[in-house]
Amino acid sequence: MLLSIRLQPEAEEDILRNLLWWAGHHSTDEALEWQRVVQKQITQISLNPDSYPLSIENDAFPYEIRDALIGKGKRGSYRAVFTVTDDTVVVLRVLGASQGQLGPVDVRHP
């Protein structure tokens, strides 16, 4: 069953911040390609969200959170942190894979 996707405002801000980083450190074309790839990969989460591993921070949250490695290249260098509510995949944050761990104060409750 294909679930709908909703990005929390923080996830949208993360994507914009990373897009601007790509544009500043690579090129506008590279940044737009990164955005296209990431949006496609986020959409693919909805096909089988339970196939993604629990986030390392999962135990700190009152609801289940999972990670999808995303981005250009064979191994995504970003992670989409998400949860599933009813029939919706809620993307909480989109972070660089090397960024620190999240706590409940870093995300908006879905």
Regions found by a protein language model. Name each.
Residues 70-110:
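Enriched for short, Lys/Arg-rich terminal
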Residues 1-67, 102, 110:
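Basic, Lys/Arg-enriched alpha-helical interface segments
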